[in-house]
Amino acid sequence: MAAFPFHLYKVVFNCMKNTASSLFINNFRRFIDRFFTRKSSALLIWLSVFIGVLAGIMSALFDHGIIWISEFRLQLIENYSDSTIPMWVVAIPISSLMAGLAFYLTHRFAPEAGGSGIPEIEGAMEGMRPVRWKRVIPVKFFGGLLALGSGMALGREGPSVQLGANVGRMISDIFKVNKVDGQALLAAGAAGGLAAAFNAPLAGIMFVIEEMRSQFNYSLTSTKSVFMSAVMATIVMRLITDQDAVVTVTHYSHPSLVSLWLYLILGFCFGVIGILFNKMILATQDMYLFIHQNQRWRFVTIGLFLGAIFGALSIVQPDIAFSGIELIPEVEGGHYLMGGLLLLFLFRIMTTLLSFGSGAPGGVFAPTLALGTLFGMLFGLAAQQLFPDLVTDAGTFAIAGMGGLFAATVRAPITGVLLVIEMTSNYEMILPLIVTCLGATMVAQSLGGRPIYTQLLERTMKLSMRRKRKETTRKAMSRVAPTEHKE
């Protein structure tokens, strides 16, 4: 008997797969049509629930992946190090290869997966940037694991937001929803990603409403979609990871009202620092662009170099490597003196800029929160020495500082307040947090500062237009050159 042709197996398999997916989608639509009167609104809500579940699963897998790859890297370092070869020397090639591979995957397959990815989502909601979820999801997931696992000073919230938003677009494409509903599901996915990353559903909801206010299409249904996705993502994340507060710190009682003016001054300081920090991020990105000129081998070489640096730092001085989330409880707990806090603050600014400005697939939320905690604790210790009657515990300023720098850089004070409260479970710190975040935002706005993600999106669009013009010119010159040669 003749063998059954292999290509027919492939045809049969594809037909079965397409039939199964079509059957699921059609049955889901019949369910909506049968049990709901406002069919489009009901479909959007149920899809947002599904997106929230997927975003929670994705974020949980990403979180476990970071833990696993970090432990695997450390195990390799311990296995190949001994009395003659110190651990930091072994860490250099391992982390270098990890970061180099992350940079290669990003540049080769999905350049939009570089950085935090939040500006890409904002651009997509305005119709200015494409969402190529088939490429971005695997590249952001595995590239982010490699970059964060190598020891670079990056956060996982950016990848979680972009992954969640791309899941939203994937579901939109599968169910063929219209453009307006597609934007709502994109926003719902972003909210779910942030909510799951920080175990903060209210912050995830408010981030979309506050930070993406110019792109978000406000309606009752779209707002409900964002709520449902954020809540479901948080529930799924908690079920998988069994996690309550992301950061375990002291639970403070509310400070005295007469000390609130100190938190306002802290906010004013963060307003100035936030503007300078945003300018330094853009300047660092320009520096890297000048070095690699968008050439792949140069871009990957930068990744190899940074991986080597952060591989060594992760062993020698881990406090200035990694995301900084693990550093927050130690700083708030009073384990550092003022001199050490100042040095850590300055060095972490440098490592954050080197990591995030390079275009590596990772976020800046967590490093910003760590920087805010460092400066807040430094300010609190100084205030405690100057006003011992007003300041009983400097740690309250560390908690307020977490939200202060975030509010100044992102220009989202309400999100900053909710994010810190949900991350630390310090609900009685709400008033000092509000004063600090509003003070930071007021100063940043008064001095002409702009939200960092808005500036990053504008920069991305300018670079994209410049590359298109260069490509058009190159094609035109290539058509003209043969003609001139013939003449």
Ranges and model annotations:
Residues A3-E487:
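Alpha-helical transmembrane segments and immediately membrane-proximal extracytoplasmic
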